Regions:
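C-terminal substrate-binding subdomain of Rossmann-fold SDR/epimerase-dehydratase oxidoreductases
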Residues: 4, 9-10, 23, 29, ...
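A generic structural signal for short coil/turn motifs at secondary-structure boundaries
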Residues: 186-189, 280
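A glycine/serine/threonine-rich, flexible loop-to-helix segment
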Residues: 134-135, 190-198
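Residue-level signature of the cytosolic catalytic core of signaling kinases
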Residues: 53, 148, 188-192, 249, ...
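Short, conserved catalytic or interaction motifs in soluble domains
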Residues: 42, 186, 247
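N-terminal Rossmann-like NAD(P)+-binding domain of SDR-like oxidoreductases, especially those catalyzing
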Residues: 1-183, 203, 225, 231, ...
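Nucleotide-sugar-dependent glycosyltransferase donor-binding/catalytic pocket residues
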Residues: 83, 98, 188-192, 220
């Protein structure tokens, strides 16, 4: 990687995933050289295909739950985004999910320590579990079932946060923690089990939209470019406590299904199914801290972002297989 001396070097674990690939694009646009690391168990090289031949980009296929060695003498930022993140993935891969939250975080922090790099952890709103406080602020400790099927992801991220703060306090590593709420946009996998691709895929395929429970549970949806902007601002800041990033505009799942049907222009219907175990009833970020510390808030309107996402999936479904 023939970087000029003044170019920051960033490592992105999970670099071929939905968020990791968008983050990579932003870092490159900001003049960073990027080393992306991914074992491809849930990532997709199609997300980084446009970077082929970019002299400031390098991809390494590697499982970060194993020791990470990089020959670069100096690295400026380590973004730890590696982890199965959709219910389908972490229910199918419970032990790898726990390992990347524990061993993967430990290895990524070790890399940051060895290279004197800032460390940015991709955490999640799932650390709040099925919250009893609404909306959720960063000082809420959560309501998590540690032995439930979702617990592998929730507790992996809670442990990762604890490990990150331990490295910050004990080793004086420059660390940041971003708690990511529901995010959507191009490069999501059509069949990853999350509600945005699920509803859009079903609507475009003429299938009923699967609404779990009675549809009264709520979510807040943030477009990916807004999220990445917040992550970049946090990485460049000197703030070390967790920060919520998400869109506080809240809607019920039934309302969301109706919006998808309207915006896809289809005649799809909804079909109600049993609610999964430990599925959160409400989810809405309090972003007061992000506004104050980062001067950040989401800017992409819901309809604008969803239309872009629908078009992405429409093209994906039409592409030859």
């Amino acid at each position: 990687m023939p970087a000029r001396a003044q170019n920051p070097i960033s490592v992105v674990t999970g670099g071929t995933g939905f968020l990791g690939s968008h983050l990579t694009d932003r870092l490159l646009a900001e003049g960073h050289c990027v080393i992306a690391i991914d074992n491809l168990i849930t990532g997709n090289t199609a997300n980084i295909g446009h970077l082929a031949g970019d002299a400031n980009y390098r991809f390494i296929e590697h499982n970060v739950s194993d020791f990470i060695f990089l020959p670069e003498e100096k690295i400026d930022y380590v973004f730890h985004f590696a982890s199965p993140a959709s219910p389908i993935d972490y229910l199918e891969l419970p032990i790898p999910t726990l390992k990347v939250g524990a061993l993967g975080t430990h290895n990524a922090l070790g890399l940051a320590k060895a290279k004197t790099a800032a460390f940015i952890l991709a955490s999640t709103s799932e650390v709040y579990g099925d919250p009893l406080v609404h909306p959720q602020k960063e000082d809420y400790w959560g309501n998590v079932n540690p032995i439930g099927p979702r617990g592998v992801y929730d507790e992996a991220k809670r442990f990762a946060e604890a490990m990150t703060m331990a490295y910050h306090r004990y080793h004086r590593i420059d660390t940041k923690i971003v708690r990511i709420f529901n995010t959507y946009g191009p490069r999501m996998r059509l069949r990853d089990g999350r509600v945005v691709p699920a509803f859009i895929g079903q609507a475009l395929s003429g299938q009923p939209l699967s609404v779990f429970g009675d549809g009264s549970q709520t979510r807040s949806f943030c477009y990916v470019s807004d999220l990445i902007d917040g992550i970049f601002k946090l990485a460049m800041s000197d703030f070390h406590e967790p920060v919520n990033l998400g869109n506080p505009r809240e809607m019920t799942i039934k309302q969301f299904a109706d919006e998808i049907i309207r915006l896809t222009g289809t005649r799809a219907t909804t079909e109600f199914k049993p609610l999964p175990v430990d599925d959160p009833k409400v989810r809405q970020p309090d972003i007061s801290r992000a506004k104050e510390i980062l001067d950040w808030e989401p800017r992409v309107r819901f309809e604008e972002g969803i239309k872009k996402t629908i078009e992405y999936f429409r093209e994906s479904l039409a592409a030859p297989r």
